């Protein structure tokens, strides 16, 4: 996976391209499995990371993810520049 855009301009952005890939994959795999309100929170995280929409992130990450769901919250927190935007429902 190699997205053709970069979410930048926010503070403490590290490995942003990989993070956006993880965000897109987690949005597809975690939302139906864990019942998180993922899409709205992902939209906020991507916007905070550089004004990219979840649609762009998901277009760049069409492949299914191999995600360890036990670390889902940690991955989303890291990808969102440590914003705690994902809450259990």
Swiss-Prot record:
Cofactor binding summary note: Binds 1 heme b (iron(II)-protoporphyrin IX) group per subunit.
Keyword terms, alphabetized: Calcium, Heme, Hydrogen peroxide, Iron, Metal-binding, Oxidoreductase, Peroxidase, Secreted
An example Gene Ontology CC term for this record: extracellular region
Record's catalysed reaction(s): 2 a phenolic donor + H2O2 = 2 a phenolic radical donor + 2 H2O
Record bears the keyword Calcium: yes
Binding site for Ca(2+): 53, 68
Compartments, record wording: Secreted
Domain of life, per lineage: Eukaryota
GO molecular function terms noted in the UniProt entry: heme binding; lactoperoxidase activity; metal ion binding
Cofactor: heme b; Ca(2+)
Annotated positions binding heme: 52
Major subcellular site: secreted
EC number: 1.11.1.7
GO biological process: hydrogen peroxide catabolic process; response to oxidative stress
Physiological role: Removal of H(2)O(2), oxidation of toxic reductants, biosynthesis and degradation of lignin, suberization, auxin catabolism, response to environmental stresses such as wounding, pathogen attack and oxidative stress. These functions might be dependent on each isozyme/isoform in each plant tissue. Active against p-coumaryl alcohol, coniferyl alcohol and coniferyl aldehyde.
Family in the record: Belongs to the peroxidase family. Classical plant (class III) peroxidase subfamily.
Protein name: Peroxidase
Organism of derivation: Ginkgo biloba (Ginkgo)
Lineage: Eukaryota, Viridiplantae, Streptophyta, Embryophyta, Tracheophyta
């Amino acid at each position: 996976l190699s997205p053709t855009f970069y979410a930048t301009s926010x503070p403490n952005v590290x490995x942003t391209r990989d993070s956006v890939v993880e965000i897109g994959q987690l949005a597809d795999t975690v939302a139906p499995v864990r019942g998180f309100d993922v899409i709205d929170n992902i939209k906020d995280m991507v916007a905070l990371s550089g004004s990219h929409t979840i649609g762009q992130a998901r277009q760049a990450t069409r492949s299914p993810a191999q995600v360890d769901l036990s670390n889902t919250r940690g991955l989303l927190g890291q990808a969102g520049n440590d914003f705690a935007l994902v809450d259990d429902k």
